[in-house]
């Protein structure tokens, strides 16, 4: 392929050819997926997985292979001119503890294992992308900055990518966040979100005490009521409740994990004030101690649907027969938005049982997901996505 950048029609033609050209390299990609997936990487404990990724970068001859203070693994694939830099990132952590059996299996249609789609495949594509580009003789004018990020999920609150972007020494023209599933995912806006945790504890239970779970139920009821009455633009998601030791005794402790989201940052701030008021009132009327902690906080914003970045991405998806999903929000873009960097999130294949130990990803669509990524890189590189 010639070194010059290409207008969009030529990029579309190239993109249509890519799935069949990538297919001979699929075995290499799947090997990286299994190697990466079998390394446990719960949030805050991704070191071994990042070390493997950087080793792959080094083997590919990339520049500036390194691990920063937050454990992010980075490398640069130099462009022909290097006039701008495109960032491709994938989070390394998964929602599975290291005690979970991380053995992966491959069948004719699927790769299965804990975290296969979230986000071992994203990291495997990141690790394999330099080899794919080299084998297919694909060269960008722009530098390609590859980044495996840490501390993304739950209490991590995207700490790794936020640290990198806040301390970057290179100007980033645009960013792409990779998620293993779902193909068709096109996230370019971030909702205002607050992920919270409420923990209720009794030192001792008196006869009149109804227990920690009952108090959480009171809090949930009040929170639902206030959101319904005061914030019609907010949504409450009850993620998990756990606590207690037996069916026959009131629980001495219990925990609620939940999410509130809205298009409006002020709504989230006001909701947090309401939660503090509810918690204080319930605690006052009991002998318990109740603590409310904010675990995740993201601001609203992102790109508009008619932004050239999104328009051209949809052209690429259409050329590959990918139907964009209706949901266009992604927390992966919020950290980019905070730094004024245009970014979107792409899914790479289809899959099942997300965030369960028997999670699995479909093999065949991966070549299409990879073609989508490469096509978009050339569109950004060629100046087809507006000012990026």
Give the label of every model feature segment.
Residues 34, 38, 73, 237-244, ...:
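A short beta-alpha structural unit
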Residues 92-106, 172, 187-198, 344:
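Acidic-glycine-rich active-site phosphate/pyrophosphate-binding loop
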Residues 115-195, 228-229, 246-248, 259, ...:
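Acidic/histidine-rich catalytic neighborhood of metal-dependent amide-processing enzymes
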Residues 5-110:
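Acidic/His- and Gly-rich active-site-bordering loop/insert found
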Residues 208-242, 249, 266-289:
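Acidic-enriched catalytic cores of C-N bond-cleaving enzymes acting on peptides and small amides
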Residues 64, 139-141, 225-238, 282-294, ...:
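Flexible, glycine/charged-enriched surface loops at secondary-structure junctions
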Residues 240-277, 330, 334-344, 349-355:
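Active-site-adjacent mobile loop/cap segments within catalytic or ligand-binding domains
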Residues 241, 322-383, 388:
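Zn-dependent metallopeptidase/amidohydrolase metal-coordination segment
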